[in-house]
From Swiss-Prot:
EC number(s) per entry: 2.3.2.27
Protein name: E3 ubiquitin-protein ligase SINA-like 7
ZnF RING-type span: 51-87
Keywords, sorted A to Z: Metal-binding, Transferase, Ubl conjugation pathway, Zinc, Zinc-finger
Organism placement in taxonomy: Eukaryota, Viridiplantae, Streptophyta, Embryophyta, Tracheophyta
C-alpha cells in the first residue's frame, strides 16, 4: 500500500525552518521511497487485470472502444471488432494506460514455495512456469500421477517403472533402433549423460500413425536443448523426418500433435509394430 506525507502550513503552528527541514528529508529520500513503493504496491483485487469478456489475464496489447470498454487481443477478432457492451468498434485503439499498469505489476513465481525467487509480470506466470527450473514435471508412464523436479524424475522412473536389465539409455549423435507397439502409444528412453527422459509417442489416426519425440524437462535455456531425426523403412520405402528442436514439456500430451511429427501412412504399416531409427543431437551444453 502507498502512503502519503502531509505537510502542515506555518499557520498551523509549524515554523518555516521545520518545513524546510521536512522538505529536505523528503527530497533526500525520494528515490528510496519510490523504490519502496514499487516493491510494496499491492492490489486488493487482481481481477481488474482480467479481460471482462473472456476473464483471462490481460496481456499487451489491450484495446478499448470509444466508450472506454476494454477487450483483449484474443477477443477482438472473435467479436468481429464490435464491443459487446455498446457495439462500438473495438480492436483498433490501444489502452495505453491499462498497458502501463499491467507492465508495472509483478507477482511471485507460482513456484515460490519450491524455491524460485523470481517475480514475473502479471499474466505471464504460465509462460515463466514452463521454463522455471523449480517447476515439477509429471512422470511420463501411463497411469502414474507422480510429479517432481526434472532432476528427481529419472530416479523415480528407474526405480518404479524400469524393468530389471532393460536397456533404456541412448547416447546423443548415435542412431538408436527402437521397436514399439502402436497400441502401447509410448516408449521412454533416457539420455546417457543428463538422465533426461525422452518420450517417443505414436498416435493412430484414420490416415496413418503420427510419431513424435518429447523431452520431460522445463524449457529453460539453462538446460540442454536437442534436435532429432526419425526414420521408418519398410519394403524398400523410407519415411524420414528431421526436427530442429525436441519439444521440452512438463507433462506429456496424449492429443494427436499438430506440429513436429512424422506421419507414416497406412499403406506402409505392417501390423501393430513400428521399427524405427532415432537420432538425438545435443545443441548446447547444460
Amino acid at each position: 500500500m502507498v502512503g502519503a506525507a502531509i505537510l502542515e502550513s506555518p499557520g498551523e503552528g509549524i515554523g518555516s525552518n521545520s518545513i524546510l527541514s521536512q522538505k529536505r528529508q523528503l527530497s533526500s529520500s525520494d528515490a528510496a521511497k519510490r523504490d519502496a513503493k514499487k516493491r510494496s504496491t499491492m492490489l486488493m483485487d487482481l481481477e481488474i487485470l482480467d479481460c471482462p469478456i473472456c476473464y483471462e489475464a490481460f496481456t499487451i496489447p489491450i484495446f478499448q472502444c470509444d466508450n472506454g470498454h476494454l477487450a483483449c487481443s484474443s477477443c477482438c477478432p472473435k467479436l468481429n471488432n464490435k464491443c459487446p457492451a455498446c457495439t462500438s468498434p473495438v480492436g483498433h485503439n490501444r489502452c495505453r494506460a491499462m498497458e502501463s499498469v499491467l507492465e508495472s505489476i509483478l507477482i511471485p513465481c507460482p513456484n515460490a514455495k519450491l524455491g524460485c525467487k523470481k517475480n514475473v509480470s502479471y499474466g505471464k506466470e504460465l509462460t515463466h512456469e514452463k521454463e522455471c527450473m523449480f517447476s515439477h514435471c509429471a512422470c511420463p508412464a501411463l497411469d502414474c500421477n507422480y510429479t517432481s523436479s526434472y532432476k528427481d524424475l529419472y530416479t523415480h522412473y528407474r526405480i518404479t517403472h524400469m524393468e530389471i536389465n532393460q536397456i533404456n539409455t541412448f547416447i546423443c549423435d548415435i542412431p538408436l533402433s527402437v521397436r514399439m507397439n502402436i497400441s502401447k502409444k509410448i516408449l521412454i528412453r533416457t539420455e546417457h549423460l543428463t538422465n533426461h527422459l525422452f518420450a517417443v509417442q505414436c498416435f493412430r489416426e484414420p490416415y496413418g500413425v503420427y510419431v513424435t519425440v518429447s523431452c520431460i524437462a522445463p524449457s529453460s535455456p539453462e538446460l540442454s536443448q536437442y534436435s532429432y531425426a526419425l526414420s521408418y523403412t519398410v519394403d524398400g520405402h523410407t519415411v524420414i523426418y528431421q526436427s530442429p528442436e525436441v519439444k521440452r514439456v512438463l507433462k506429456l500430451s496424449f492429443q494427436t500433435p499438430q506440429e513436429n511429427f512424422m506421419l507414416i501412412p497406412n499403406s506402409l504399416l505392417r501390423g501393430d509394430v513400428l521399427e524405427m531409427r532415432i537420432s538425438v543431437k545435443k545443441l548446447n551444453k547444460e
